[in-house]
Amino acid sequence: MRRWIAAVMALLLVFLCVGVSAESTGETATPAAQATAAPVTAADIAKLNRPVSDLPTHVTVGNATQVNGNFFTDMWGNNTSDMDVRTLLHGYNLVAWSSQVEFVADPMVVKTVSTKTVKGNMTYTIALQTDLTYCDGQTPITAKDYVFSLLLCASPEMAALGADSSRYENIVGYDAYHAGKSKTLSGVRLMDDETFSIAVKADHEPFFYDLANIWCIPYPISVLAPGCTVVDTKNGVQLANENANQPVVPFTVDGLKKTVFDTTTGYMYHPVLTSGPYMLTGYDATTGQVDFKLNPYYKGNYEGVKPVIDTLTLLPAHADTMVQDLADGKFDLLNKCVDASVILKGLELRGKGFTADNYARLGYGFCAFACEKGPQQFTAVRQAIAYCMDTATFVKDYLQDFGLPVYGYYGMGQWMTLAAMGSLRPETVSAADSAKWDKLTLDKLNHYDLDTEQAKKLLIKDGWTLNADGKKFVEGVDTVRYKKVGKNLMRLSIRFAQTEGNAAAELIVKQLQGTLPALGFELNVDVVPFTQLLTDYYRQNGERSFDMCFLATNFLSVFDPYTAFSADGSLPGNANVSGLNDKKLVQLALKMHKTAPMDFLTYEQNWLAFQERFNELLPTLPLYSNVYFDFHTDWLQNYAPNTYSGWPAAILYAYYAEPSTEATPAAEPTSTDGTDSGTGDGEIIIE
């Protein structure tokens, strides 16, 4: 099985017009004397070789996922296009993602980071650069801005508005502060305008991703909490009244409703004072159009790269017209194309003034279950539904040869997946460890191949043997199965939310309509806008109305499913969107979390154990992972998205100019700045 998957991966990356270079396959096409030359990086080209345009330059980007308007933080959800907007608007994270396994301090932001153990807790002391400002060029960014960011995001006031602050639960003092039992966040200290510290709970150490512990983006207190300031006390940091003579702190839920969620001025939809490479100049919630212009005061990303394209526009793109719209000039760039029909049309434009880029996906497509309620709360029902899906046929119909079925919580671009396939190993590995690596495969994962008889057996064993009258279910007579749950009968009814105009969701529904009713399921399908689906998925209106839906996600910088599954699955918000509460799964995720940094073998072993438990429980129904394609005009040069960073990171290195006859080949950015930190479920995508 492992060899077959690896072979298919190779076909995807070599034979399907993906254009893998000699460098990326490990082969060399240069004489030995030239092989030692340092490769030209995207940063080299961006800083040295980009031409300066005499006229303003503009790029219009099309993405199949329309923005939802969450431009402040991912604490209320992670629509992929919202995440792209945030990456453009919010910068100066303390840490940058230098590879798929490591964060480093961003040298443009941080002078030094030192660590020491205090009372068993690892304490990180951060000294900042002194020339950071927001996009107005007048408001300085100091240690207070980072401390305010932590106080704000971990606050009970934000939680009352539905924010998921689980990212911050590793900070000492979080529990008391978040619960409203303490006004201070004891694990954070403010030394001066340039220096502050963050203490991490001992029971969260070690942490495989190490410096991800200090992930933090600055936010302006003058905008989000006017009248407030940050002070340090002997017990930690806290918010205080800007007027020292006034004891009442003007930081309330009602105040945040105004500063965050006001539809015309709120920081969620219209963040004006920001720190990233671009500034927001316009947002139309109806059309989904978002406009940006350069932030002239931006210092650069972790490699010192600043963007040169003057303005950007992000628009929703529709699968049936997007390639023609690219050819007609409506778009300059199409991002994250998945549908095989779109990809094949896009590939036809190559050599006609357009270029194709591709990269393996870190995430996967899946059917989401609301595991906190209804028939789908039972593992046997989820497994039965899995046996009613012909995943291989679905993947072939939807992706053709541009994707693969998956059977767990993983994507084909993750190093852990590649290692389990046998196609990736650490650079130096002993013979003994090599044998251990060879034993780590995905072969134990159940594929849940189409088998309606097995599905029926699972239902019967789980007690779905009654009819509406509480008597024995008789096939051919009764249509819907029931189960006695407590004193009541539960109907085997699934309400599926199908995103309007979504080809993948249509294929899934068609399959389920052909299998589920014959087994005694009732399947109700609601065709809804993507924004409505997301509102329900994130429980923004309380209890979820839908039992299933089709979605896709990309795992972001930190693959840490502990935070994704450790929260109470019945609570509203972004935490544990599967709704499943399983102690064993959480403990397996925690073992991954607490793997020592750079201990790849142990992490892989823990990762595989987690995947096997996930595959058994099916918090979601995994379907596929795939190769992404971006298509763009060849006027957009030095643009090279990759598995680890999307178009907002790649656009910093790009420029817009008439292509020369001997254009400099694009080189991939080596990483992203980690503006959005994924901790399990990442960005949510419409495909």
What are these regions (language model features)?
Residues T41, T60-T117:
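N-terminal lobe/hinge region of extracytoplasmic solute-binding protein
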Residues K111-R167, M191, S197, D325, ...:
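Aromatic- and charge-enriched surface segment that lines or borders ligand/interaction sites
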Residues G162-D254, S423-E427:
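Surface-exposed binding/hinge segments that line
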Residues E205, Y209-L211, K396, W464-Q498, ...:
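Bilobed periplasmic-binding protein-like "clamshell/Venus-flytrap" ligand-binding domains
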Residues A212-K306, T311, T452, K457-K461:
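Gly/Pro-rich hinge or "lid" segments in bacterial periplasmic/extracellular proteins
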Residues T264-Y269, Y297-K345, E522:
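Ligand-site clamp/hinge motif
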Residues K293, Q377-G514:
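Append "and occasionally in soluble cytosolic enzymes with long acidic Gly/Pro-rich linkers
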Residues C388-D433, A504-Q513, R539-E687:
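Detector for C-terminal structural segments
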